[in-house]
């Protein structure tokens, strides 16, 4: 019953990217939220065993790439397999943000973040990031919305 209600919650769809030296990875996420305006803080919830979890914790940087409503396939590309086994960036254009985190130039928008704090929340960690830079790349598009189990 509770899982059914949980699936009724609607979220945006994001690709959270990070970099640790030469290792780059990204994962699809829906549990992203604004936290504060002063300073500008955003959080993402990531399961403890995830490869991105390890890289963010070690590097202290990450970016949130906001997908648009035509990019469901991009969300699936970053959502189904672990970066431990697959290079999710193979063949994709990407740039580097001020922090060094990968940015997907085809995304609707991005936020470049420096890890400020980490909070254990059950089987996930909440990574609290301070915004270093943010930009809407394609304002003519609309953000992609996640329902039920589209990408996970």
Regions found by a protein language model. Name each.
Residues 1-152:
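Basic, polyanion-binding surface patches
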């Amino acid at each position: 019953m509770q899982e059914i209600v949980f699936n009724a919650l609607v979220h945006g769809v994001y690709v959270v990217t990070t970099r640790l030296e030469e290792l780059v990875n990204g994962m699809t996420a829906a549990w992203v939220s604004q936290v504060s305006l002063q300073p500008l803080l955003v959080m993402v919830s990531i399961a403890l065993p995830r490869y991105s979890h390890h890289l963010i914790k070690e590097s202290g940087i990450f970016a949130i790439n906001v997908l648009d409503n035509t990019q469901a396939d991009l969300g699936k590309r970053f959502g189904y397999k672990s970066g431990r086994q697959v290079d999710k960036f193979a063949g994709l254009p990407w740039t580097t943000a001020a922090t060094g985190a990968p940015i997907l130039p085809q995304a609707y928008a991005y936020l470049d973040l420096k890890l400020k704090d980490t909070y254990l929340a059950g089987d996930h960690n909440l990574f609290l990031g301070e915004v270093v830079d943010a930009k809407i790349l394609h304002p003519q598009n609309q953000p992609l919305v996640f329902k039920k189990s589209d990408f996970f």
